[in-house]
């Protein structure tokens, strides 16, 4: 069961110790431990079936039907962004952003969040009128309007075209720098992980196989020598061997 951290200023926003999650006889997470600090951006890589989404669902309190054990502490204020923006098609954009937000200034907060993601003026649009990238901007606004201490993102840009993904990377980096939530991004994209994260984890057979700090200033240049070194190291942990590029 997850417990919730209450106001310990120096405590990590997320603390996981010896976490086990199983589906029937199959163990998905096997004694996993992890801390995430306030304002820290952590990316999680792993092959299909390694337990990435299971960990995210555990942190989001969405796995109550899964058997398991271990210590799991998360903040009360958390938001989740999925690959599918999950907007309600019968509600307009602003209504989607403030859905469930029971505050007297909810509409004002929602408009401010939409302005942050570059969608001011689209408050009354229907979701079907938006592009895929715009729908994900709405999903980000919906998450950030709640001022979360923890932002969980499960392949949020996986369905977007390459150019839109790059724009969303810049937007997410700026928003996280401004709001300072702890972030866990689940992704299959090694370059995306190295571009955005302060730290990249590789999950293998339900345990953390690698924990690599990204010691490159932001915004990051993919042509930076260190970027290539970290990419190669992560790919090796994922079972992909790379060869150095030979000079022409």
Swiss-Prot record:
The keyword Ribonucleoprotein does not apply. Its main location: membrane. It is found in: Cell inner membrane. It catalyses: ATP + H2O + aliphatic sulfonate-[sulfonate-binding protein]Side 1 = ADP + phosphate + aliphatic sulfonateSide 2 + [sulfonate-binding protein]Side 1. One of its GO terms (molecular function) is ATP binding. The complex is composed of two ATP-binding proteins (SsuB), two transmembrane proteins (SsuC) and a solute-binding protein (SsuA). Part of the ABC transporter complex SsuABC involved in aliphatic sulfonates import. Responsible for energy coupling to the transport system. This is Aliphatic sulfonates import ATP-binding protein SsuB 2.
């Amino acid at each position: 069961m997850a417990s919730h951290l209450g106001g310990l200023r120096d405590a990590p926003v997320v603390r996981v110790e010896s976490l086990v999650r199983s589906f029937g006889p199959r163990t998905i997470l096997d004694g996993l431990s992890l801390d995430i600090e306030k304002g820290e951006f952590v990316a999680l890589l792993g092959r299909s079936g390694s337990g990435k989404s299971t960990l995210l669902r555990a942190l989001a309190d969405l796995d109550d039907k899964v058997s398991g054990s271990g210590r799991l502490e998360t903040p009360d204020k958390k938001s989740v962004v999925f690959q599918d923006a999950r907007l309600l098609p019968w509600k307009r954009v602003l209504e989607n952003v403030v859905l469930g937000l029971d505050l007297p200034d909810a509409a004002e907060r929602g408009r401010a969040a939409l302005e942050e993601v570059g969608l001011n003026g689209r408050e009354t649009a229907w979701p079907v009128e938006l592009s895929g990238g715009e729908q994900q901007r709405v999903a980000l606004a919906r998450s950030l309007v709640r001022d979360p201490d923890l932002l969980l993102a499960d392949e949020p840009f996986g369905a977007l075209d390459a150019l839109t993904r790059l724009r969303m990377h810049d937007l997410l980096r700026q928003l996280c720098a401004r709001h300072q939530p702890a972030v866990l991004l689940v992704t299959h994209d090694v370059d995306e992980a190295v571009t955005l994260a302060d730290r990249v984890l590789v999950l293998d057979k339900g345990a953390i196989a690698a924990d690599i700090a990204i010691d490159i200033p932001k915004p990051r240049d993919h042509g930076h020598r260190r970027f290539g070194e970290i990419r190669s190291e992560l790919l090796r942990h994922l079972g992909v061997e790379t060869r150095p590029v030979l000079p022409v």
